[in-house]
Amino acid sequence: ARIDQDFLDRHEVGLIFGNDSTAEATMHGLDKFREFKDTSACGSGAIFQSMNSTVTMSLACIFKLRGINLTTSAACASGSHSVGLASLLIRDGLQDCIVCGGAQEANMYSVASFDGIQAFSLREDEPTKACRPFDRDRDGLVPGGGAATVILESYEHAVKRGAPILAEVVG
């Protein structure tokens, strides 16, 4: 996107990121509380580990972003919702440029929850047949974590700064 820290320092760039479940570190903090029967055993940083907004808070601090800072949480669609919301804010002229996407870790707690409702594919020994979301014969999900980021900006803003335009959000 040809965006460097100097650009971020000079412009009001926003950040909208999606994620939807608790980090493993939070669960370990709760284990300490249970063991010692004392909330101070969780540590002063526990609050930041337990909030979904920690991803956007951390990224905004690291990159010194001054625009909108928002976390979306809508299960597996959290990252997609961040892109949709960013495009609306840009379309309505409320932001020129927004970093958006999603991040989700896979940990034993989130995986166990899905396994508990028998949501996973039974074809784990056949990976090419396991994840087929639009297939009539699908039989479940494949667990995993990951992250993706896109930079959305108005057409005028992108042209003005000479950005390579790779795609357009329409609809």
Predicted ranges, named:
Residues 79:
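Short conserved active-site loop signatures built around small residues
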Residues 82:
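Active-site histidine-anchored catalytic micro-motif
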Residues 125-171:
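Condensing-enzyme catalytic core mediating Claisen C-C bond formation in acyl metabolism
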Residues 1-73, 103-111:
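Conserved beta-ketoacyl condensing-enzyme motif
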Residues 49, 76, 141, 145:
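Short-chain dehydrogenase/reductase
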Residues 60-64, 85-94:
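Alpha-helix C-terminal capping segments
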Residues 94-139:
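Acyl-CoA/ACP chain-elongation machinery
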